[in-house]
Amino acid sequence: MSREKWDIYLRDRLLALVEETNAKVLTFDGVVPYPGVIAAKNSNPNLKLVWVRRGLWQKKPQRYVLGLQSAMMDKIIEPGDVARAYDFGPTSTRKDAVLTSPVSLFRKADAMSREDARKALGLDQNRPTVLVQLGTGDSDVNEKMTAALSGLLGWKDLQVILTKAPVDKNGNTLAPDGLDLKVVRYFPLANVLHAFDAGICATGYNGVHELLPAQVPTVFVSNIRGTD
């Protein structure tokens, strides 16, 4: 599907959903509001558009684009960030957003104990366990996954837990031989974070604001491509 057709399709799908649910507000959580999202708002004068615009953007020239995108919104919400003091990106000096507390699915009261979390995930209670959340896709991201997994080879009796199979787009494994790997599906993962002795995670908003409050010793690996 071409980009133009996709934008039209997204607009029409959103408008149909708004009509079906009688929604009054459309919320976009992302870096760049898609043309289809903007088109949906422009096609329905009664629809309010809210942009959940996270901070810590890369320090790249925005010219007029950021201001134009922001002006199209009825409201902008910026989720707080534990690293906000180090935000020197183009949104850091803007005064057009409502700042909230950091948003996280981790709640101490809801988090399982180490024992219960390991039972829920089917893990050995006594072996060391590491969570790896790095994603896959482009070659540079795949290389980081392979490097991270290779670095764990010397850890005796280690259980390595992933939320996605470590394979490239062609189905080739990114993991070295000699690791005990397990892919888990559990939501919300924040409730079972006490199962892990350590983590290797992409520096995404959700990962940072779940693993840090859960006090899981974690190596955060940044991806500076594109809008990441």
Where are these regions (language model features)?
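Short, charged/polar "capping" segments at the starts of alpha-helices
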Residues: 59-61, 83-88, 140-141, 167-174, ...
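A donor-sugar binding/catalytic signature common to diverse glycosyltransferases
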Residues: 28, 186-228
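Short, well-ordered alpha-helix to beta-strand connector turns
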Residues: 23, 72-74, 94, 179, ...
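Short glycine-/small-residue-rich Rossmann-like dinucleotide-binding loops
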Residues: 31, 81, 135, 204, ...
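Active-site and donor-binding regions of nucleotide-sugar-utilizing enzymes
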Residues: 1-90
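A nucleotide-sugar donor-handling region in carbohydrate enzymes
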Residues: 54, 59-60, 69-136
